[in-house]
UniProtKB/Swiss-Prot annotation:
Solcar repeat ranges, renumbered to this chain: 6-93, 101-214, 223-312
PROSITE patterns according to UniProt: SOLCAR (PS50920)
GO cellular component, one term: mitochondrial inner membrane
UniProt xrefs under InterPro entries: Mit_carrier, Mito_Solute_Carrier, Mitochondrial_sb/sol_carrier, Mt_carrier_dom_sf
Organism from which the protein derives: Bos taurus (Bovine)
Gene name of the record: SLC25A22
Entry's family note: Belongs to the mitochondrial carrier (TC 2.A.29) family.
A Gene Ontology biological process term: regulation of insulin secretion
Listed name of the protein: Mitochondrial glutamate carrier 1
GO molecular function: amino acid:proton symporter activity; L-aspartate transmembrane transporter activity; L-glutamate transmembrane transporter activity
UniProt keyword terms in alphabetical order: Membrane, Mitochondrion, Mitochondrion inner membrane, Repeat, Symport, Transmembrane, Transmembrane helix, Transport
Record function comment: Mitochondrial glutamate/H(+) symporter. Responsible for the transport of glutamate from the cytosol into the mitochondrial matrix with the concomitant import of a proton. Plays a role in the control of glucose-stimulated insulin secretion.
Amino acid sequence: MADKQISLPAKLINGGIAGLIGVTCVFPIDLAKTRLQNQQNGQRMYTSMSDCLIKTIRSEGYFGMYRGAAVNLTLVTPEKAIKLAANDFFRYQLSKDGQQLTLFKEMLAGCGAGTCQVIVTTPMEMLKIQLQDAGRLAAQRKILSAQAQLSGQGSAQPSVEAPATPRPTATQLTRDLLRSRGIAGLYKGLGATLLRDVPFSIVYFPLFANLNELGRPASGEKSPFYVSFLAGCVAGSAAAVAVNPCDVVKTRLQSLQRGINEDTYSGFLDCARKILQNEGPSAFLKGAYCRALVIAPLFGIAQVVYFLGIAETLLGLPRVQP
């Protein structure tokens, strides 16, 4: 097994390359997911993913769909690199006895990977959600302001339009959170992130490994790239839908700004209880298909880059058979 020890720098580079490509491709869908998950009953501005994206383009322009992308593009490299490299590391450590990994050990490796990645994922998601949801809140205020003007047209005193709230930047948000809440401000929703990412990794990595194994040639060579891509897509979408209820709760908890008449939450259980009481069980599946559409190609691309060993080629290292 010693000759198969993984090259950590190569895995980190592969994970980073995959993350950058994937985020660039699917970020608008992720924005739609965040806005759909954050809108509550009685305050619905969007009826579907396509409706959200169309309204976003109309009100904020094409690049409005990429609000918060800079945060993801900056932090997705360490985030994806940690996730993939940690899973590889734990799988290697758990297979040192020369035995084939059991399903339990594969799930254990995935659990370790999911736990490691939240170091980067939590602040990344915290900042991204504020930037993504700012457009929804601004549009809601604009609609309410227009309604107030219409209702006040018959009054003697003319209504004054409220000044537009400046939209925050990632730097401003980070500075404000650190000043007001310290480092803990960037890690709000850490528990919910763990409850989402650990089960996701427990489902994703073993499912991917077994699906990828089905496409491995009888000669023992690595699976073709299209098999790795499809295995990543299927495993990613299945895991994403499975943990979507936790993702809805996490999104609500990490949203610092609320719309008119929207609930506030004191913690994970309080948030889950209020969603169930006020919006019903179906609310936990808000944005599920968006999340599946985001995760499927994101992890499909990641696994293709990872299994092609682009970094190994760049660094002149031998490819380790997965």
